[in-house]
UniProtKB/Swiss-Prot annotation:
One of its GO terms (cellular component) is cytoplasm. GO terms for biological process: galactose metabolic process. Keywords: Carbohydrate metabolism, Cytoplasm, Galactose metabolism, Nucleotidyltransferase, Transferase. Disulfide bonds: none annotated. It is found in: Cytoplasm. This is Galactose-1-phosphate uridylyltransferase. It comes from the Bacteria. The keyword Nucleotide-binding does not apply.
Amino acid sequence: MEICSLINRLIKYALKNSLITEDDVMFVRNELMALLHLKDWQDVKENCQIPEYPQEILDKICDYAVEQKIIEDGVTDRDIFDTEIMGKFTAFPREIIETFKELSQQNIKLATDFFYNFSKKTNYIRTERIEKNLYWKSLTEYGDLEITINLSKPEKDPKEIERQKNMPQVNYPKCLLCYENVGFAGTLTHPARQNHRVIPLTLDNERWYFQYSPYVYYNEHAIIFCSEHREMKINRDTFSRTLDFINQFPHYFIGSNADLPIVGGSILSHDHYQGGNHEFPMAKSEIEKEVIFDKYPNIKAGIVKWPMSVLRLKSLNRKDLVDLADKTLKAWREYSDEEVGVFAYTNSTPHNTITPIARKRGDYFEIDLVLRNNRTDEANPLGIFHPHSEHHNIKKENIGLIEVMGLAVLPGRLKFEMRKIAEYLKDEDFEKKISDDKDTAKHLTWLKAFINKYSNLKTLSVDEILENILNVEIGLTFSRVLEDAGVFKRDEKGKNAFLKFINHIGGRF
């Protein structure tokens, strides 16, 4: 039976990657047989190739389950089922926590390397999907920005969407980040997590948990979430916790989305941070104007050369950093400057907050404070300091932590739309073709603004147009999107307004 062969291959994969030992083989085989309603077993002797990740085997097992009417043939049904399968190979939480602790006593990087690799091998991180994402770097005046087009989310068919609508509403787990997700079986509206494990942490004397993001937008993309389901809040404790984290994980950065709609992330209902082993473009950006805080002689400070408004603080002294960061946050919460359209409140609704990012530089602690404002008006209903409408063809979604640091996460539609445009650009009447096509018409104004810079279109292949023109311009557009989100603009008026705020919090130049 072919299904026995597939189970055998999956068991060999698990053995090769130390997910199980020989002593576990019979137990796991019987578990999988029960899951697949198999009443008999046929021994298979074959020299099969073991893949790096298990998805190819899992897809075939899911095909069998569909044929046998064990599951429906929907993307979510398959995800739920293959997660249940991999859950059979995933060690109990206590074992993973114990291994992580033992390794961290030798070296914290050994521990994170183990946990990240484990999260990929159990297919909690669906590596084969993530590898579909497009990625490139774009040179701008702010250095190389990083661009990714997100193609890893599979499309659901209409029947599945309809079934989801008819599902009864439940509140367990309360959200995608809650601790209750560990081992959860999943539903059509909430992902299965039998292969999900988390590591307990103490941050500033409070219980938090460390996990990896299943979507991995950058290397070792981690999520650090509170044990309690409570709303996102940026305050003094945020700075204490983030500095505590990088003290424990000096090879990682950590940052928080802002705590207000529009300028915040997609999950404001559960207090959490994101981190990882990646140096973002913003971290590479230099100080363009040094700032002195006389009350904090141990802190080196400055305004960062970045499209958004960023104050960088650096010190060996964590307490001083927390004090000044908190002072800056409290002042910014109440700060208005009519001349540049910054208002702290509309009636009693607050608009000002901060996106903080922390990292270690040798023995130094460094924290970037990105000033944010979520006000809207009639001309900008999605946000004044938000991607402007002329850039919505490329990016109209919120500018969250990852984008703030210089990595654009762009919608999957762009892959298809840009390829079409590249093909049309080979024709004389490309403007008409682009405007007549509902998929590409929205890009015409954007295209006309730069296309005359490029005189050799006819000699380039479609791939060359994509790589050397369209990808370059997408990167430049992303830098302008970040400028849109900056509260103090990069012109003289904006720069002076930023200096005025720095003076307001006790800084001088």
